[in-house]
Amino acid sequence: MLTRLSHILNNTLTKDIHVGFRKMANVADHYNDPVSIAVIGGTGLQSLPHFTHVATLKPSTPWGTPSSPISILHHPSPSTGKPIPIAFISRHGLHHELAPHEVPARANIAALRHLGVRTIIAFSAVGSLQEEIKPRDFVVPDQIIDRTKGIRPFTFFEGGMVGHVGFADPFDNKIGKLVRQCGHSLEGEGVRLHDKGTIICMEGPQFSTRAESNMYRSWGGSVINMSALPEAKLAKEAEIAYQMICMSTDYDCWHDSGDVTVEMVMGNMKANAENARRFVGAVLDELSKEEHNEVVLAKHLEGEMKFAGGLTAVPGRSAEAKEKLGWLFPGYFE
């Protein structure tokens, strides 16, 4: 059930986030240097030690404004000690004002790419569809089944320019490998990790019926949430390496352990919050190492959309579509 309650929990944690990290005396409203790494979620990351809030940005994009201001945090590189900028965005807004289908995912992803972001770590609380994935376990998924209903805008390529991008592997294998290594390094210290799994991304905001929950289990679903899509698809279109980290807070309604309550979910989330912070903090430490620069900059994805998004012949490309995509991909479609 928490899958669908995850946005409630994320909001609760977001309140803690914005009072937990170290703020500079004067936080800037601009940031001129490229930011390669971003976190999407509401997980308390800014309360991690050694993160300093240096800027709060309020960008606009051709697809609207993001779901929250973007916080820029400085994090010392484990390799050099130099500050590494990390962008943080709250998926459901600072005050949890956005339902899952209202999240402006295109604006979120576009704003992050425009900043220079090429790697996204997304965090999501989820419900478990399998007995072996217990509450408080972490899952680094490798697949998604789309059970959204087309309500959410899900592509940058429309209105006069068509683009097709492969989505066989919805999460980035290179970033995923590093995330799994970090998770396994914390096992035995409160972290229990499942290093693959299939997310069912449902539309919401209502919860599943028992029949639906059992159907998802029969399909091989591992966990369920409302957040993975269209976020992962848009990141793929934007040539951004994307990996979600899931934290199980309950069994979905298929389980005979009884109805899930908000109190139960909140209890598990609170009890595991420190493990979540340590996990994501370890991932950011690893990604900040100079040896991973090529992976973090997603050089293996660079230029993919120049071909995949160039399907529409030049005479057929609308001025509006060219302008929007030119903002996202400068120089690609001139």
PLM regions and their residue ranges:
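Metabolite-binding pocket within alpha/beta catalytic cores that recognizes anionic/polar moieties
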Residues: 2-5, 9, 13, 20-168, ...
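Generic hydrophobic/aromatic pocket-lining and core-packing "Φ" positions
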Residues: 109, 213, 229-232
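Non-catalytic positions within long, well-ordered alpha-helices that form the structural scaffold/packing
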Residues: 113-116, 217, 236
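Mid-sequence, gly/pro-rich, charge-dense loop/helix-turn segments that line enzyme active sites
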Residues: 123-213, 218-219
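Glycine-rich tight-turn/loop motif centered on a GG-T
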Residues: 160-168, 221, 256-268
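Zn-dependent metallopeptidase/amidohydrolase metal-coordination segment
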Residues: 226-263
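His/Asp/Glu-rich mid-to-C-terminal helical/loop segments that flank catalytic regions of hydrolases
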Residues: 252-303
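Acidic, Ser/Thr-rich low-complexity intrinsically disordered segments
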Residues: 303-334
